Amino acid sequence: MGTVVIVGTQWGDEGKGKITDFLSQGAKVVSRYQGGDNAGHTIHANGEVYKLRLVPSGVLYPHQLSVIGNGVVVNPKSLVGELARLAEQGVTGENLRISDRAHVILPYHIKLDKLQEAAKGADKIGTTNRGIGPAYMDKAARVGIRMADLLDKEIFEERLKANLKAKNEEFVKVYDSTPMNFDDIFEEYYQYGQQLKQYVCDTSIVLNDAIDKSEHVLFEGAQGIMLDIDQGTYPFVTSSNPAGGVTVGAGVGASKIDRVVGVAKAYTSRVGDGPFPTELLDKTGDFIRNAGHEFGTVTGRPRRIGWFDAVVVRHSRRVAGITDLCLNSIDVLTGLDKVKICVAYERDGERVENYPASLKFLSECKPVYEELPGWQEDITKAKTLDDLPENARRYVERITELLGVDLLTFSVGPDRDQTNVLENVWDKVSR
């Protein structure tokens, strides 16, 4: 076999898209397995900038299959638009496959998302208002509409009527809002389904057939483990499982996963509300934000910035079974006189080594930092660790020591040729 899962080890935006694009060069199939179009990533390739939300990055390469698995919630309108934009950049999308079991995001999910978030007031979670949570709620409540339903006009009509009746009652009675029109949604979204019909199939069969043929399959997680609904900073999380969702969300058995690659930035960022122990609210945070262009791909919101938190990434390593590390954006820290790594927390005079479940407990913790000298040299052309200035190399080595995991790649810029490989993950799965 030859299967690799890529997961973010922080709160998303770690550069997973770049690493997925890089590692996908050795893959036959690239698959998403959770999340929705709330998870944007940017890929720089062939002199073009591709901004993807739903489509796996393998779609850029005609010899690869790109799979949207059953664990993904699909906004048909968003997906049709994304494919149209890719077509304008010369990407046909003919190699895309969409699970017939994937659930569909409809306009009432988006409206409900906005109303629920507004009703929370100061307790808002920081959702992207794209209907992800309400779609997963319908899935769990067993009233969701799947891609297979969207393609069947009678079934879609029947289920949409039932769902919209319930949602409109909620809009009017709970939120004092206006109801939505059935005909408008039905006609528009049925047509989206027809446009996507050519891509829809049982993707579990596609993936397992590829694995059984010993083809290299790359699974691409969205968001980050600290946004996992079970393992993240609940309730300030997403509605799916970036950490361990690959087997259920792709329809492959756990025994078929070979390596799990964790992606981290050399610092930490977060979009939206929720705990962030190493957050920087000073000029250092502003420096890193601007140097790293830290603004959301989907929302455009400025990301919150903090020092690298080894407690967070160790937690991610454990719960996701991470075997290898890709460290990105080291170049962003160039120009700082000093850099810090959070190695533990401290609460009431006691050292805390593991990330707590209780947000109250976490709010009482303070980060324990190791301070290292920074570097001023331009590192964007470095190809090996030895090419890095001593202080930058010491910083990278200290992170890997604290995490206890092998470094697979390190990146010193946004372009593919600025990602440097220490060991090829596909060689590891072939051993």
From Swiss-Prot:
Chain residues that bind substrate: T297, V298, T299, G300, R301, P302, R303
GO biological process: one example: IMP metabolic process
Binding positions for Mg(2+) per the UniProt entry: D13, G40
Cofactor note as given: Binds 1 Mg(2+) ion per subunit.
Residues where IMP binds: D13, E14, G15, K16, N38, A39, G40, H41, T128, R142, Q223, T238, R301
Pfam families: Adenylsucc_synt (PF00709)
Highest rank taxon of the organism: Bacteria
SUPFAM superfamilies noted in UniProt: P-loop containing nucleoside triphosphate hydrolases (SSF52540)
Sequence intervals crossing the membrane: none
Enzyme class: ligase
Catalytic activity: IMP + L-aspartate + GTP = N(6)-(1,2-dicarboxyethyl)-AMP + GDP + phosphate + 2 H(+)
Annotated family: Belongs to the adenylosuccinate synthetase family.
Purpose of the protein: Plays an important role in the de novo pathway of purine nucleotide biosynthesis. Catalyzes the first committed step in the biosynthesis of AMP from IMP.
Protein name: Adenylosuccinate synthetase
Annotated organism of origin: Lacticaseibacillus casei (strain BL23)
